[in-house]
C-alpha cells in the first residue's frame, strides 16, 4: 500500500490545472497588462476610451487603473482625465535599457558631445507617439535645455522624435502619422502632415533632424538615430540649446558631432533593407 504525502502550498485544481483563484488572478493580470500596453502606445486615453478599445466593462477598467495608479504604473491627468504610464513603468523600462547596456554606453558619449558642442546632450527612445528621454549630460551654461529622465516630448516637435520617424518602417510611419495629433506648440511647429513628411524625407537624406524652435520658442535641437543590429532606429541622441548659440553657422559642425556620436552608439550598422522589402 502506498502512502500519499500532500506537499505544502496552495491546493491544486482538478487534473493538476489552475484553481479558480489562480485563474482569476491570471485573468486580472492579463487585463492589467492589456490596459498598460494600450496607454503606453498612446498620448493619453480616458477610462471610456480604454474600455471601448479593449471591449472591457468600464467598472473593470476603473478597478485596474486604480490598482495601477496605486503602484505608480499609471497616472491620470486631472484636467483631461486621460491616463498615461506612470513613473514606476519608466523604472521598469529603464531596467531593460540598463540590461541592454545602451544608457551605460551612452553616458561617456553624452558627456563628450556636451563638451564638444557646449550644449545639453540627450538620449531618447520611441514611447508610443512620444519620445521618452532616458539620460542627458547638462551643459554648464546658465540658459540651457533640460530633459530629465522620464520626460516625454511629442514626436513631431522634437529632434529625436523626427529622427526616429524619418527612419521608421513605411507602414509604421503611415500608422503613426494617421494616429498622431499634430499639436501646435509654436509658430514653427509642423502641424500639416504633408509638410512633416517632406521634412522627414530631408532628415533621412542628410542624416540628422533639426527641431527649429518647433517645441519651445528660442530653442533648437539637432538629433540623429541610433541603429540596432537589425538596422532599425532604436533610439536617438541629440544636443539642445538656445538658437542664439546654435546658430546656422554652427549647425554643420554640431550635426557632424551628433551623427558621429550616434554611429558610435549604434549596436551595429547592418545594411537596411529596401523600403519595399521592409513594408
Curated annotation (Swiss-Prot):
Biased composition (Basic residues): 1-13
Cited PROSITE patterns: HTH_ICLR, ICLR_ED
Superkingdom, taxonomy of origin: Bacteria
Residues within the DNA-binding region(s): 47-66
Record SUPFAM superfamilies: GAF domain-like, Winged helix' DNA-binding domain
Gene3D superfamilies for the chain: 3.30.450.40, Winged helix-like DNA-binding domain superfamily/Winged helix DNA-binding domain
Gene Ontology biological process terms from the UniProt entry: negative regulation of DNA-templated transcription; regulation of DNA-templated transcription
Record-annotated HTH iclR-type domain positions: 26-87
Keywords annotated in UniProt: DNA-binding, Repressor, Transcription, Transcription regulation
Segments forming domain IclR-ED: 102-271
Molecular function, one GO term: DNA-binding transcription factor activity
Pfam families referenced in this protein's UniProt entry, alphabetically: HTH_IclR, IclR_C
Disulfide bonds: none
Region Disordered, annotated ranges: 1-21
Function: Transcriptional regulator of the bhc gene cluster involved in glycolate and glyoxylate assimilation via the beta-hydroxyaspartate cycle (BHAC). Glyoxylate negatively affects the interaction of BhcR with the promoter region of the bhc gene cluster.
Remaining remarks: The beta-hydroxyaspartate cycle (BHAC) consists of BhcA, BhcB, BhcC, and BhcD enzyme activities. Overall, it converts two molecules of glyoxylate (C2) into oxaloacetate (C4) without the loss of carbon as CO2, under consumption of just one reducing equivalent and regeneration of the catalytic amino donor, which makes it one of the most efficient glyoxylate assimilation pathways.
Name listed for the protein in its UniProt record: HTH-type transcriptional regulator BhcR
Organismal lineage: Bacteria, Pseudomonadati, Pseudomonadota, Alphaproteobacteria, Rhodobacterales
Protein encoded by which gene: bhcR
